[in-house]
From Swiss-Prot:
Activity modulation notes: Activation by tryptophan (a hysteretic factor).
Transit peptide endpoints, chain numbering: 1-76
Provenance organism: Nicotiana tabacum (Common tobacco)
Gene name tied to this protein: DHAPS-1
Gene Ontology terms: cellular component: chloroplast
Full protein name: Phospho-2-dehydro-3-deoxyheptonate aldolase 1, chloroplastic
Region (Disordered): 54-76
Pathway: Metabolic intermediate biosynthesis; chorismate biosynthesis; chorismate from D-erythrose 4-phosphate and phosphoenolpyruvate: step 1/7
Tissue expression pattern: Leaves, stems, and petals.
EC code: 2.5.1.54
Amino acid sequence: MALSSSSTTNSLLPNKSQLVQNQSLLPSPLKNVSFTTNSTKPVRFVQPISAIHSSDSSKNPIVSDKPSSKPSPPAATVTAAATTVTKTEWTVESWKSKKALQLPEYPNQEELQSVLKTIEEFPPIVFAGEARSLEERLGEAAMGRAFLLQGGDCAESFKEFNANNIRDTFRILLQMGAVLMFGGQMPVIKVGRMAGQFAKPRSDNFEEKNGVKLPSYRGDNVNGDAFDAKSRTPDPQRLIRAYCQSAATLNLLRAFATGGYAAMQRINQWNLDFTEHSEQGDRYRELANRVDEALGFMAAAGLTVDHPIMKTTEFWTSHECLLLPYEQSLTRLDSTSGLYYDCSAHFIWVGERTRQLDGAHVEFLRGVANPLGIKVSDKMDPSALVKLIEILNPDNKAGRITIITRMGAENMRVKLPHLIRAVRRAGQIVTWVSDPMHGNTIKAPCGLKTRPFDSIRAEVRAFFDVHEQEGSHPGGVHLEMTGQNVTECIGGSRTVTFDDLSSRYHTHCDPRLNASQSLELAFIIAERLRKRRLGSQNVLGQ
């Protein structure tokens, strides 16, 4: 049940009637689930074990050994610029016939194959029904009826894996989601860069220090960041540890999302201690107090605030699809739809360095049914983007493709309009999302990488300005951030200076927004969503 609302106030704070919308259930892992384990044959078309998926109704038996009757995707030929891509029948291993970039070289191939076979027998980390639900939500964002909030670590680590860190990142995402929801008065789709975001692409295969040359650090699921030969040697056993950490992280996230922690009645308790007395903390507390007032009003009016929709939230996981042998090992045939899903995460994306039309990563992704992201910089040719979307989404399904732009503010204003126009001319449905982090990385005088908050804010504003100019929908934001009180990005209202960087610089890879900076950015985005909403209302009222 929802109260009607047509707020025209200039405040980002909620009316008492805006609270019932946008809270819904996380697809529960405790319902009947469906997955299949990979066979040990070189080419796997049929998996031997299947069961009903979470969030899906099905008349199929709980256990079945019948092969899927779902045909493989038809062959097609796609040409982009000077590259001709011939699409043949897809299998979970067809990517191996393509050139695969950014994959580590394991010295012990027998051990690697043994580990991958072990992971094939493990349960899926996520369920296909959950990925389909996310695709539906992203389809709404493509139409301007929802907004994606995607955030988390640049790269998860084994060392910082603990319940408090997971809780704090989840908590700041809840806070940001509440701010965005009240600004835009639309559902906010919360997706974490969590429970699997380990592997990182590198510019160089090797790193050299003081005349010593070693393999580059590629993420904790591949090798260690310590600069010694043992740490830097790719170790297959790290894949099993990454799987276990991902499963444990998602287990805790599910508990937070469905166990009462995410209840709207707890909105005042989400504030992190170190943001308590900041400007952003004060703004958030004022918003939270209005929420409490509205909940009290609802209870007095006889509207229950104990309904599950007010006590839970949907939350999904995502990571870059980089380490293809691992992703293949967690790919399962869904008995409900007859489609393959990469069950390592709900949402996976292809990066700037691995999105070649004839490359192994694109070949793998075209055959899995998860919602997919494409990272796009100012180097992306509009026609190549159209061809890539054709390969990954030949049925032009809403929610299937999310374009994550990472360009820097000035490049955004120049390059993004051409991409939007090319996609529109092709009639393709995509969700446009801004990644204001990767195009704004600089080196501080002390030698550490950092990102100026002013540059991040400028790119977000440019993203909204371009979509307003083009008449398209700004569908979301993709952030590298943490709930910890780190000093990695300079600027923000609680100014972090170059001199402050070394005090709490904990990232294993790229600099992240801290909780205060993340919340400040959420208020900035919420204001743009509010103005966009009021502008649409004014147009409709004329």
